[in-house]
Amino acid sequence: MESITFGVLTISDTCWQEPEKDTSGPILRQLIGETFANTQVIGNIVPDEKDIIQQELRKWIDREELRVILTTGGTGFAPRDVTPEATRQLLEKECPQLSMYITLESIKQTQYAALSRGLCGIAGNTLILNLPGSEKAVKECFQTISALLPHAVHLIGDDVSLVRKTHAEVQGSAQKSHICPHKTGTGTDSDRNSPYPMLPVQEVLSIIFNTVQKTANLNKILLEMNAPVNIPPFRASIKDGYAMKSTGFSGTKRVLGCIAAGDSPNSLPLAEDECYKINTGAPLPLEADCVVQVEDTKLLQLDKNGQESLVDILVEPQAGLDVRPVGYDLSTNDRIFPALDPSPVVVKSLLASVGNRLILSKPKVAIVSTGSELCSPRNQLTPGKIFDSNTTMLTELLVYFGFNCMHTCVLSDSFQRTKESLLELFEVVDFVICSGGVSMGDKDFVKSVLEDLQFRIHCGRVNIKPGKPMTFASRKDKYFFGLPGNPVSAFVTFHLFALPAIRFAAGWDRCKCSLSVLNVKLLNDFSLDSRPEFVRASVISKSGELYASVNGNQISSRLQSIVGADVLINLPARTSDRPLAKAGEIFPASVLRFDFISKYE
């Protein structure tokens, strides 16, 4: 995609006086950067003054030649809300349907969206859109119109070739309409073309991250936590040996007793020719300032009880030798987490070391498999049935990545049963991961059910193999992933889309949510598909270089292709110039397992 220049103008008396209170402007700039590649974004804050607003907009239109300007704030009913009035005087063409579309989609989220008066229109070669001032509303509005912006810019700029390209891509697609849940195919084209555009993987991920809300800002909580105690809280011995005064020199010393880990520090007098036998981690006596390790001593005498009474110190003691001072590892009021780490092992262990037992909130997840043909692995297989492997696979994947499945259920191909089950599940869970029922068959009811339940379907198809019908939908803070029913498709789309969303909701940093990626060399030629393909492969290490061997037949129904799969190789779509991925070529690969190297040569 070519570069689009954006401007984000925050219009608010409060933010103009206190810029740190502007949250909507930074959110918009972040969303633009995440959604559009090679994008230039400038921003500013102005007060709710009509003349000043117009002056800034004119400068951006004429001098900066921005293609899209998004204003945030000043669209309500308050006396100083004048953004639409300031904008209208600059517009050569108004775009009422675009404004209506934003309003209608926003009303699905809150009835108060009806109180926004934002305008959309064209001034010169610039598209101007008035968005509300709240952070939440800005995010929702941007998600509504982001996919339309490139085509709108092409139309305004009379970029004929790009306009024709977009028209060609959408030509023949059926218009999205309500589908009767009990309807079967009539044989007409409208039944056989998906109303959902096929979105690129990265665009789908951007939509997911911009939609899913974190259950808690774990990163913020952790980064602001200070240590309530010193670690160690006392001077601790680093080694097994003898605690003494460093001024006492080497030679024979009388052993006064033994101090073990867990004993209280003693404050008894200690002469220069005396010492205490001490264990690793034990507290030093108050008057001792060093430890001589047991290897640098020689036992001279035992008392009548078999306890050490005399020992020869073979080295000169030095102050601070083998002693951890108070607070050496962590001092009171130090930040506990100098950097973020998504690992619950790290987080819980470090918090436990300072006496803090943090209960990490995890998203509640349910697994649903649809299909009248499915039979539980515990039951006898009957004619026309197949065993349900998806429920087991998805449940185990959740556990493997540190999450729990609260509920599982298998549904027959019934609109009403599917609707009732989803309603019940969303009463108690945050995410439903469903396999099957999202394609174009006349028994695929899932998308119709979602529409009936007033979920917003953000994505109905992805430009990917396997997994094209992958669906993502939301309603407020409830999220639905519809994975294809073929086991391998469900496996791939879980890793690429559902897992990152659940991690993000759990408080992980966005950059840590997706699978780790490394580069691998192909061992053999592989025929490319018309869609970008994620191929299951095992990894072989040869002299420090990583090679990928494709795991046999990659058909989406063949679950055996995940056996021994270490990575998903990300292969590009086929072109006339490049029909093959050739042996020796390097491609990015998403890592599936912690132990991702199957063989060393």
Curated annotation (Swiss-Prot):
Span list, region MPT Mo-transferase: 184-596
Q: From which domain of life does this come?
A: Eukaryota
Q: Which GO terms describe its biological process?
A: establishment of synaptic specificity at neuromuscular junction; gamma-aminobutyric acid receptor clustering; glycine receptor clustering; inter-male aggressive behavior; Mo-molybdopterin cofactor biosynthetic process; molybdopterin cofactor biosynthetic process
Pfam families recorded: MoCF_biosynth, MoeA_C, MoeA_N
Q: Does the keyword Transmembrane apply?
A: no
Q: Which residues carry this modification: Phosphoserine?
A: S376
* Annotated region (Disordered), positions in chain: 173-195
Q: Report residue spans for region: MPT adenylyltransferase.
A: 3-153
The cofactor(s) it depends on are:
Mg(2+)
Gene Ontology CC entries for this record: cytoplasm; cytosol; dendrite; postsynaptic membrane; postsynaptic specialization
Which pathway does it serve?
Answer: Cofactor biosynthesis; molybdopterin biosynthesis
Recorded hits in CDD domains, A to Z, give: MoeA (cd00887), MogA_MoaB (cd00886)
What EC number(s) does this enzyme carry?
Answer: 2.7.7.75, 2.10.1.1
GO terms for molecular function, please?
ATP binding; metal ion binding; molybdopterin adenylyltransferase activity; molybdopterin molybdotransferase activity
Q: Which family does it belong to?
A: In the N-terminal section; belongs to the MoaB/Mog family. In the C-terminal section; belongs to the MoeA family.
Query: By what name is this protein known?
Result: Molybdenum cofactor synthesis protein cinnamon
